[in-house]
């Protein structure tokens, strides 16, 4: 039987998503470090390595062995645990999610007030930016989501300068990341920034993977 401290679950619709946490391995830390995120920040961001996922539906429980690189993102909106399972190298199921559009990644970790804040497209990018610039960062469930006006108003009351920092899909026929960023920027009167095309890196974590932490710090200073 799984111990509760190593076991998270969240009811979602008619199914329940659960996972079992395992110990961190050297290859896990190497993977995350390559994107500018260290173990202390993984712990801060409630990112956990996992060995199994479980789905209960119609009173039947299904067990799935997680891939080698498999992680759970935990969020605690209003005291309710939600899970997002991330398998970055999977060709079958990269994501599983028990949350909904109202759940923001890293919301619980935000300081009460601050000078600057990034709104990114993923927890990975948010943690990368936060660790390497010490500027708080959060993310929605994806770039295509539209936040509530009340949530944006709260963020504006807490942070003096907010920046939308979505993907620059420079290598796609349509740059959806830029389109979403421009839409939110216009809708909520928040400036947006992106990785310049010349770097051929779509987001902050990919940028660190290609150019390193120090180069990211330099770029952010130029962009804001």
Model-derived segments and spans:
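TOPRIM metal-binding catalytic domain and adjacent DNA-binding surface shared by DnaG-type primases
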Residues: 1-79, 109-112, 220-224
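Residue-level marker of alpha-helix boundaries and capping positions
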Residues: 18-21, 116-117, 171
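Residue-level preference for alpha-helix termini and adjacent loops
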Residues: 23, 40, 103, 206-207, ...
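Compositionally biased, low-complexity repeat tracts
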Residues: 24, 41, 45, 55, ...
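Phosphate-handling DNA/RNA-contact segment within nucleic-acid enzymes
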Residues: 53-160, 176
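TOPRIM fold recognition
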Residues: 114-115, 124-224
